[in-house]
């Protein structure tokens, strides 16, 4: 520094430093506010997601019976799990649900015929959908004289995973819905006049109930749920009957788990009664269409949660994060789909190369 150069007064330096700090603060403040509103919250547990629905999210306002979030989450979890039971266990599923207070327990199954399957395989480029639609339906009497109608769509069946995941390739339709999931949802909706319940000693069809659910003072409430593939069908079915059949959104709520993307990127849904609970470790929600329908509540499991629940599939953070980072780089559903099928051999290779990261049995 030459003698002619003068040092800036200390107070000017202080002002500059404070100005920089203020700018940084404002950037982070507004960025945080923006992403908090636009991007789904990253929750640490389902328990926290319950509190989030109760206290923190103004977008989610569920009416009447649906304000009991604890009950809704517990019921949807139990129903999603029981929907997985094979047909051979229909009777035990019915008994289990009856113990929980449900009535009119039925299993809806729309299996494609052998001819239909043959045509689908012969015409791989045609728009032929061949996945079966499986759903458990039941009713439950609520305090106050209302009747809850539950529809639990079955998720991906490991014995039929190739057919089920083939739905992930289907493009969106003109309305912005995923074609494969929409096909399954419509197949179920078409049978609404065939699904019959006995309520208050009277026969009533699901179609008649849906007609009543257009009213504000309806005595029927509906809970729709599902996991994985069943979650996407549940979302689409709910969105479809809300939009196309004019169901009052105070009469229905949908809670799903591990939900694939089911609509176009630019598809907008102003309702707030479709809630998707997603484990950030799960790869299934990264595939499907381009966007999720409804509100997503993300939670990131703790290591103790992973170790307890993943069991033999558990790997410590270093090994898991390597694969997780790879998943985050996918640019299309096709790539994500291929990565899902590469998961098992990849983990096997990771275990060979990084055995210290894996928990031995």
Regions found by a protein language model. Name each.
Residues 3-18, 25-62, 146-148, 193, ...:
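Serine hydrolase/lipase
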Residues 28-130:
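N-terminal low-complexity, Ser/Thr- and acidic-residue-enriched intrinsically disordered segments
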Residues 88, 104-225, 242-253, 268-271, ...:
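A conserved cap/lid and substrate-binding interface adjacent to the catalytic center
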Residues 230-231:
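Catalytic nucleophile loop
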Residues 1-6, 10-11, 102, 119, ...:
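Generic N-terminal leader/processing signal
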Residues 79, 151, 282:
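A residue-level signal for conserved active-site and pocket-lining positions in enzyme catalytic cores
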Residues 27-34, 65, 83, 101, ...:
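Intrinsic disorder/low-structure terminal segments
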Residues 82, 140, 154, 279-280:
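Structured loops at beta-to-helix junctions and adjacent beta-edge loops in soluble globular domains
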